[in-house]
Amino acid sequence: RFPTVYVIKSELVEIRGSGSATREIRAFMHPDNFPNAVKLNAVEVITPDGNTSSYPPHRHDGIGDCPFHNEEIYYFRIGEIDSPHGCSSGFGFHRTYSAPQDSISFDDNISVRDGDIYLVDRGYHGPCTALPGYPMYYLNVLAGPSLERNMGFCDDPTYSHIRQDWKTQRTDPRIPWRISK
């Protein structure tokens, strides 16, 4: 049996990206914060309305030159301004596409609604886009065959400039996220 792990919320929250790619990560089951799990990783992502997350597109499928291998599940919740989730009219977008070295070619651009679940077992994925007026939350759960648990990823080199661009942009002031109602 594993010992009980207690982590203070303020130690879990990370602000990632900047500009319209600012989002909040709650890394409650990241290997650094929850070291006793064997395979499972999990984080929550909060994307303000009009912003993108899971960006730049990345992969962790163990194919080609990417050494990280995790399947990933996205569980989406779509809200309205000042409401955490449960909006039946709102939706967002998610993209998953093949890397050049993949044996199968695909490019899936899908709309996601409140309560949708999406499995990423290979390829690049991102961005997730929250439409104006509809903030997006998702729970990411990752696990894979690696002997050492990790949340590593390989960015799509086409978008290598994105992380550099963030250095010249301000973070979105809506993050950290607060519900005002």
Which residues fall in each region the model found?
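Generic recognition of flexible, low-complexity loop/linker segments
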Residues: 63, 107, 126-127
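A short glycine-rich, His/Asp/Glu-containing loop-to-beta-strand
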Residues: 24-73
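Double-stranded beta-helix
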Residues: 1-27, 132, 139-181
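Conserved metal-binding segment of the jelly-roll/cupin
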Residues: 1, 111-133
